[in-house]
Amino acid sequence: EEYPNRLPDEQVVTFVPQNEEFRYGADDMIEFFSKNPVKTLLLINPDNPSGNFVPMEGVHKLAQWCEDNDMQFLLDESFVDFSVGFKNNTFLDNALLEKYPHMCVMKSISKSYGVPGLRLGIFCSADTALIARMKKQVSIWNINSFAQFFMQIYPKYREDYRVACEQFIQARED
């Protein structure tokens, strides 16, 4: 909801799965956006609120399709920590970003760690020109002291967080 509201309605093309479960994969998105071209493709993976998850091979397929079609690919991984095998489901990897220069990966730390007031997140891309443009747009002090403190104490709780994510995944599977 936040992303489309940043653009005029006529610039937003929304993909809605045509099934009762609201499930979709890379092929469904490629088919839809081949008929409804866009400059930027946004995938929230896993999706919120449906929980739909496009596996890594599907995300690779979308990323390559975007490269082949000179299309920006925004991948929001804010909830990837709650996916089965989450450690292997992220594109926050320099080699992957270099492979797909049209890709940008975002992750809200605030959401997954349950600290939404901090407004803390990650944005990664191999597109250094894009990063430079973005840096010019953010305020000089773009992280507050609470968020900075959180990042300082995070390593102390990293293992607890990993265990909690695995317990959450197991509870959902049961």
Predicted feature residues:
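PLP-dependent aminotransferase class I/II
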Residues: 2, 102-174
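Active-site pre-lysine segment of PLP-dependent enzymes
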Residues: 23-35, 49-112
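Short, contiguous strand/loop micro-motifs
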Residues: 16, 49-50, 162-163
